[in-house]
Each structure stands twice: as structure tokens, then as C-alpha cells.
Amino acid sequence: MKPASVIIMDEHPIVRMSIEVLLGKNSNIQVVLKTDDSRTAIEYLRTYPVDLVILDIELPGTDGFTLLKRIKSIQEHTRILFLSSKSEAFYAGRAIRAGANGFVSKRKDLNDIYNAVKMILSGYSFFPSETLNFISNTRTPKGGHHDMPLSNREVTVLRYLANGMSNKEIAEQLLLSNKTISAHKANIFSKLGLHSIVELIDYAKSHELL
């Protein structure tokens, strides 16, 4: 039987290598690409079928949610496992609603990634029970969800702003115009009721987004 093909996307080389070594003990899994560059991954996906993409939500130059949509537009059956070192309670819920097949916090045991990959390739999803309980317990009486009122792109901009980046630097990083970043910034401050960068940094820290 042909091994399942896997792409590993993470900004840290040591993380990419560690995951490859971890998956290498399973002869039914083949890592076909390791990269931190979304363009490299997209080019590969346009040429070769891929069973699973292990995707860091906080990749440089993009965000995992935007990249998930691009991947699905090329190969709709490719499965996605999100990784993040940031707030599990916040990001895992968004991962479920974005259509990902699993989420693993990089703060947890590395074997969680291996177990998640096996389950997802077997046709299951992998979301920690704490995440599912969190989502269940935060349902509003009308069936909605208590959630940060920002889009995924606005969350990315918020994180960059909280890390001290200028509008111009963020625009260059995300390949957007200064005008677009300014609009995102205004929306962030308006939606969250913030009045200064100091308040924005405090907000990001309190939500474990830094």
C-alpha cells in the first residue's frame, strides 16, 4: 500500500525535523515536504496529491486559516492538522469551525502530534477533550458561541501589532496594502473597545496570543 503523503509546515526548523523523525517510525507515512514558506507548499500541492498538511497557525507571512482555504481550493480532500503554541482554548475552537481535521497544542507532548496524524489519516478528527468541553460550555442560550469578535485576519494583525510591528511592516509581511492594514487596525480597536497600543498588548497577553 502506498504511504500517506504528509507536508509539514512550521516556521521552526527544529520543529519540522522533530515531527519528521516522529512520523518516520511509521512506514505507512511519508513526509514529502518540510517548509515554512506557503508559496512552496502551494506549488507542491498544485502538482502532487497530498493526504495531510500539518500546519502551524502562526506561519510567517500568512495565517493558517487563510492557507487552509487555499489548500482546500486546490485539493479539497487534503486533511489539515493545525499546530499552535498559543492559546488552545481560542485557536482550537476556530480550527474546528474553519474545517480543520485536528488541532494539537505545541505545549503538549510531541506524541500527541503522532496520535493525531494516525487518527486523521484513518478518517477521524483529533481535538483535545478540553477543547470540545470548552466549546460545549461556552454555547450561548441561542446556540451561538462566546468568541473574540475578530476575523482570523484581524487576529493575525493584532498579534503583529502587539509584537511592535508598524503598519508598513505588517503590510509587507502579509502582502497587503498599508490602507488595508490601517482598516484592520481600526476595526480591531473598534470591536475590542481599545484606545491605545498598550491596551492592545494587554489584551493580547490576557488571551495568550503572544
UniProtKB/Swiss-Prot annotation:
Residues 167-186 bind DNA. It holds the Pfam family GerE. GO terms for cellular component: cytoplasm. InterPro entries: CheY-like_superfamily (IPR011006), Sig_transdc_resp-reg_C-effctor (IPR016032), Sig_transdc_resp-reg_receiver (IPR001789), Tscrpt_reg_LuxR_C (IPR000792), WalR-like (IPR039420). Residues 143-208 form the HTH luxR-type domain. Residues 5-121 form the Response regulatory domain. Keywords: Cytoplasm, DNA-binding, Phosphoprotein, Transcription, Transcription regulation, Two-component regulatory system. One of its GO terms (molecular function) is DNA binding. It is found in: Cytoplasm. SMART domains: HTH_LUXR, REC. The modification 4-aspartylphosphate is found at D56. One of its GO terms (biological process) is phosphorelay signal transduction system. This is Fimbriae Z protein. It comes from Salmonella typhimurium (strain LT2 / SGSC1412 / ATCC 700720). The gene is fimZ.
